[in-house]
């Protein structure tokens, strides 16, 4: 017999609980920053801004903001969610102090914060998170400003705000670098692309810079200067290429037998899609030596709207690359993987990027960098602490199932325990995550 469901109004609600902790899973992020040395590195980077020894450590304040963003907050006041829980999270700086720390970070200190991030990343990779290959995805996105902010401007979509350019590591999803730009910044600015690439490379451990690195970009990366800079830096490139009239004419000259079947991620044939190489049909002498032009032809999905440039029911896309190899289907598949950067950007906007709270442009750049730290914390947690579906979960799911877990903090003698609800479906996963993290030697 099924028991009748209890009526909520019969449950007595009081505010006299003792030792209860909400967002208990956030302690995993805090301990992660300590164990991989990020907290100590940030403290060292911002040591000069500490007003007195009794004041809050600026590095820890910045760490707390990053943890708050990783937990789903989007403004400084959201850090209040951890007040009254000092036994687990430690003392939190006031809103005024937090704003003061963020606004004290100028361009020089921002460079030191980036170095601190790189130090922690090297330790995370040494702890087992080093990717098997290195593929950098560069892309821009639009952020709306809902009030007057310094250098906010109209954009090509008739909105108003900023147009940051960022770089994410495809294999792990880590947010390596981003620069804030006015809303009217160009999409194919070579200098901005190379600046972001340089910042991203600086985030990689020194020994990994000796490996083959591929940078991917959409058509915004199709500039002679950027591809030449990639060649000078010893970086392979794969960038979108404009379908000019010359390119379209070359495509129409390709015979049916010169198209090869495109493949999907599993290596199987991709229905309705073919690939061909146009290198010998287009003058690429102005591009770096060894550049190749590859084209994909695909039937648009049912219901898709055709453009006036689609020919014979097919849609064409091209990319320019200096990768070697005769398997052009595999090269096209690798370039197509660039689309995953959209997932990274979406997750980034859900982790502090969407809302830039300050008026000053410099302060919003600091906030953007703090968002990158938050994105990395979630990535590192999945890489070294989680398994199964949680290891690939998006931020919203991680927060709902792990970070927002309720618990009770109890003390027995000299031992302090964080007791999770045994009926919560993901309690065991959170316990296992702490165990995996603590198996890594502490570095601070």
Model feature map: region roles:
Residues 1-161, 166-186, 191-207, 382, ...:
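Dynamic "connector" segments at or just before major functional cores
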Residues 32, 64-65, 76-79, 94, ...:
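Short, conserved catalytic/metal-binding motifs centered on acidic residues
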Residues 89, 143-145, 174, 184-187, ...:
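Flexible loop/turn segments at secondary-structure boundaries
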Residues 150-154, 229-235, 252-258:
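Short secondary-structure boundary/capping segments
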Residues 187-246:
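Domain-level cores of phosphate- or acyl-group-handling catalytic modules
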Residues 354-430:
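Basic, amphipathic alpha-helical segments enriched in Lys/Arg and hydrophobic/aromatic residues
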Residues 1-11, 15, 236-349, 432-444:
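An anionic, glycine-rich sequence signature occurring as long contiguous blocks
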Residues 32, 79, 328-381:
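Short amphipathic alpha-helical "interface-anchor" segments enriched in bulky aromatics
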């Amino acid at each position: 017999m099924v028991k009748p469901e209890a009526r909520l109004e019969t449950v007595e609600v009081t505010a006299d609980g003792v030792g209860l902790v909400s967002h208990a899973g956030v302690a995993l992020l805090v301990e992660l920053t300590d164990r991989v040395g990020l907290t100590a590195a940030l403290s060292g980077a911002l040591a000069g801004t500490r007003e007195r020894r009794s004041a809050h450590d600026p590095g820890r304040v910045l760490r707390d903001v990053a943890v708050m963003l990783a937990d789903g907050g989007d403004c400084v006041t959201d850090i209040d969610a951890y007040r009254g829980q000092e036994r687990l999270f430690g003392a939190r700086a006031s809103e005024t102090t937090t704003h003061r720390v963020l606004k004290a970070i100028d361009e020089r200190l921002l460079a030191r914060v980036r170095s601190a991030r790189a130090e922690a990343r090297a330790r995370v990779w040494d702890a087992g998170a080093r990717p098997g290959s290195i593929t950098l995805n560069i892309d821009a996105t639009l952020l709306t400003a809902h009030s007057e902010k310094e250098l906010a401007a109209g954009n090509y979509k008739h909105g108003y705000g900023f147009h940051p350019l960022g770089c994410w590591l495809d294999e792990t999803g880590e947010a390596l670098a981003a620069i804030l730009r006015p809303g009217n910044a160009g999409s194919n600015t070579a200098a901005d692309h190379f600046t972001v690439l340089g910042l991203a490379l600086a985030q990689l451990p020194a020994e990994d810079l000796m490996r083959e690195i591929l940078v991917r970009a959409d058509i915004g990366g199709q500039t002679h200067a950027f591809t030449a800079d990639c060649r000078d830096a010893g970086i392979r490139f794969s960038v979108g290429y404009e379908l000019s009239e010359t390119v379209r004419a070359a495509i129409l000259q390709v015979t049916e037998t010169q198209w090869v079947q495109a493949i999907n991620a599993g290596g199987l044939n991709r229905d309705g899609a073919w690939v061909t190489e146009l290198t010998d049909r287009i003058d690429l002498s102005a591009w770096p030596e060894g550049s190749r032009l590859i084209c994909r032809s695909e039937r648009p999905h049912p219901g898709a709207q055709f453009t006036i440039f689609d020919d014979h029911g097919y849609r064409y896309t091209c990319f320019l690359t200096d990768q070697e190899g005769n398997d052009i289907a595999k090269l096209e598949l690798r370039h197509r993987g660039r689309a995953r950067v959209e997932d990274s950007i979406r997750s980034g906007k859900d982790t502090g990027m969407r809302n830039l709270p300050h008026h000053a442009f410099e302060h919003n750049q600091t906030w953007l960098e703090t968002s990158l730290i938050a994105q990395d914390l979630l990535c590192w947690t999945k890489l070294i602490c989680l398994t199964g579906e949680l290891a690939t979960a998006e931020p919203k799911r991680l927060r709902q199932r792990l970070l927002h877990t309720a618990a009770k903090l109890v003390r027995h003698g000299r031992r302090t325990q964080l007791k999770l609800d045994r009926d919560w479906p993901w309690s065991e996963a959170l316990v296992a995550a702490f165990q995996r993290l603590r198996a890594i030697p502490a570095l601070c």
